[in-house]
UniProtKB/Swiss-Prot annotation:
Entry similarity comment: Belongs to the heme-copper respiratory oxidase family.
Top-rank taxon: Eukaryota
EC number(s) on file: 7.1.1.9
This protein's UniProt keywords: Copper, Electron transport, Heme, Iron, Magnesium, Membrane, Metal-binding, Mitochondrion, Mitochondrion inner membrane, Respiratory chain, Sodium, Translocase, Transmembrane, Transmembrane helix, Transport
Source species: Amia calva
Protein name as annotated: Cytochrome c oxidase subunit 1
Name of encoding gene: mt-co1
Biological process annotations from GO: electron transport coupled proton transport; mitochondrial electron transport, cytochrome c to oxygen
Length: 188
């Protein structure tokens, strides 16, 4: 199991990084800003998330009989990932603050991503606690956590990027009303 999760866990943190970049571009653009709030903090946060993903793999293995010190380490290390993640969410919201916001579809996808990612992150903090994780192991709570963060989160970021850059790549624009309806149906 250690071999599997040592590879498999960092992968999910790396998979979400392009979504972070797309959301940063979209939020800054539709807030009328040149760059996101706290640009260097965002860069360091992405690097920290990428690196911390390599030292928390065993939080997938709390139920296999690890000793208490090992569980305490992996609980703490997993919770530390919430700090750079919180920096990113705060910076996206701070970028929107005081901006001339254009409420177009890509921004809706980005805001949907921020909401879903935040809910998924809160469920992740609960699951990082090894005592609670043992109770919640193999339940829909865990399924909800990774679907909020990666399945829906990554899809919303990708859709935001697609809707934002599709006119640039193709020369065609998407119908604004139908694309907003598409977002609404996906969000519900």
């Amino acid at each position: 199991q250690h071999l599997f999760w040592f590879f498999g866990h960092p992968e999910v943190y790396i998979l979400i990084l392009p979504g972070f970049g797309m959301v940063s571009h979209i939020v800054a653009y539709y807030a009328g800003k040149k760059e996101p709030f706290g640009y260097m903090g965002m860069v360091w946060a992405m690097m920290a998330i990428g690196l911390l993903g390599f030292i928390v793999w065993a939080h997938h293995m709390f139920t296999v009989g690890m000793d208490v010190d090992t569980r305490a380490y992996f609980t703490s290390a997993t919770m530390v990932i919430a700090i750079p993640t919180g920096v990113k969410v705060f910076s996206w919201l701070a970028t929107l603050h005081g901006g001339a916001i254009k409420w177009e579809t890509p921004l809706l996808w980005a805001l949907g991503f921020i909401f879903l990612f935040t809910v998924g992150g809160l469920t992740g903090i609960v699951l990082a606690n090894s005592s609670l994780d043992i109770v919640l192991h193999d339940t829909y709570y865990v399924v909800a956590h990774f679907h909020y963060v990666l399945s829906m989160g990554a899809v919303f970021a990708i859709m935001g990027g697609f809707v934002h850059w599709f006119p640039l790549f193709s020369g065609y624009t998407l119908h604004p009303t139908w694309s907003k309806i598409h977002f609404g149906v996906m969000f519900v």
